[in-house]
Amino acid sequence: MKDIWSQQGRIALERDFWIAVMKAQRDLGVPIPAEAVKDYERVKGQIDLASIAKRERVTLHDVKARIEEFSDLAKRQFIHLGLTSRDLTENVEQLQILRSLKLVHFKAAAALLALAKQAELNRDLMITGRTHNVPAQPTTLGKRLAMFGEELLSAFTRLEELLNRYPVRGLKGAVGTQLDQLTLLGGDNGKVDQLESRVLKHLGFRASLSAVGQVYPRSLDFEVVTVLHQLGAAMASCATTLRLMAGAGLLTEGFQEGQVGSSAMPHKVNARNCERICGFGTILGGFVAMTTGLSGHQWNEGDVSCSVVRRVALPDSFFAIDGALETFITVMRQMEVFSAAIAAENERNLPFLATTTILMEAVKRGAGRETAHEAIKEHALAAAKALRSGSGDADLLARLAGDRRIGLGKKTLQAILSENVRFVGAAPHQVDAFLAEVHPLARKHRGAADYQPARLL
């Protein structure tokens, strides 16, 4: 990702673009000597950022400085024929975006496969499901991970859809009419279309905009950043829950040999990587706000008020999602689940976790739903208070068995609790459904299943 967005990398892309346009123009009849093309190709790798910056301090125009630099190196003046600055910058920036999206696409597939592996490993591990962060009903850890995985998969699908249709601006000139290329090519619309096709092929895009002005719609930038935010949001939600579980001692994101959790408290094992993922999500949300400010504010055929925002928001959005993906994959590979602690939490909460099942069994045996609901609520709240305060009757089962409104004896209630495996409902099958959607990604994206992220600091 760093290579795609580096200044050196961008200038290399620009020079390749100029040469591709020059070759196409020459093939279509523009009088450009073959030796001139070779001269540009010979020096295209000689990128002197200091020299370009020196020129820009004089011209106060970044593109003009880069034109002069490249032309002086080649000792020729055949690049940028019939082009405006935006013919260069828009197309090259969109190429950077396209390549970045493809890299994100691969790493998102790797993230989904890593998450799916954990979901499969923990398919049947019953945990205490929580709503409002309060014990609710049993689920499985695999289902919890699949829940967040499904959100990530939805974002991944949206990313694929965007990649399949993302259009490039193309060579459209100062206001989008292609006037200068038409003039250069003798007014031949067919040749202009051929030039456009050659540029499209060089850049690797499937489609170009046909009626665009000087700039492509900035709502496209918004669409790009929002899909990155959606990917980040799914990972951040998962990371938030892993942080909560780590705080309860139910799992760890991984703790490496020699790692220190706190400079003051030697015992600390913090979920620092999960916290980092959440931080990246916040950053991406900020860039969504920035690109929102660009959408719907184009003046006529275009202006450059968007430039300063885009120079920050676009590369940094990709750096943020790249960091989030690298960190998320690392967490999925290194996390360790403490099944004994999970079992202890289940045992502590089990009578309360079974209340909806008890309610349904009571209704099946003829109890009125609202009557039984009120009775179970009264006993559950009283038992919970007694349990937490250390005084009073905390035996929820005995309380329920003694209430005629519910109509279930102690043996029946004990039998219900003994079948606690069924309390997770369809969770294992839902995990299987998620896995069936994700596993094909390993075939479609070779290397994604085995992708090893860089070592995190």
What are these regions (language model features)?
Residues 283-369, 375:
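Long, amphipathic alpha-helical stalk/connector segments used for oligomerization, subunit docking
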Residues 2-6, 51-53, 259-279, 301-316, ...:
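Short beta-alpha connecting loops at secondary-structure transitions
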Residues 197-214:
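A short, charged helix-loop
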Residues 143, 222-230, 357-365:
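Short, well-ordered beta-strand elements within core beta-sheets of diverse protein domains
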Residues 1-178, 187-200, 261-262, 272-276, ...:
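A helix-coil-helix interface module used to build multimeric assemblies
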